[in-house]
Amino acid sequence: FREIKGYEYQLYVYASDKLFRADISEDYKTRGRKLLRFNGPVPPP
């Protein structure tokens, strides 16, 4: 997927044999991704 810094984009994470939608925000200051919220019972990374 394309990394868009400063913008929020949807990321589909495959976990527990099920597909959950997660909203991920790219933060270029910390050079990482900040998890906003998970739509589903997804265990923490």
From Swiss-Prot:
Question: Is Glycoprotein set as a keyword in this record?
Answer: no
Q: Which InterPro entries match?
A: Cystatin_sf, Monellin, Monellin_A, Monellin_A_sf
What domain of life does the UniProt record list for this protein's source?
A: Eukaryota
Protein keywords: Taste-modifying protein
Practical use, per the record, is: Natural monellin has not been mass marketed to the food industry, primarily due to the challenge of large-scale purification of the protein which is relatively sensitive to heat or acid treatment.
Which is one Pfam family of this protein? Monellin
Which function does this protein serve?
A: Taste-modifying protein; intensely sweet-tasting protein.
Oligomeric state and partners?
Answer: Heterodimer of an A chain and a B chain.
The protein, known as: Monellin chain A
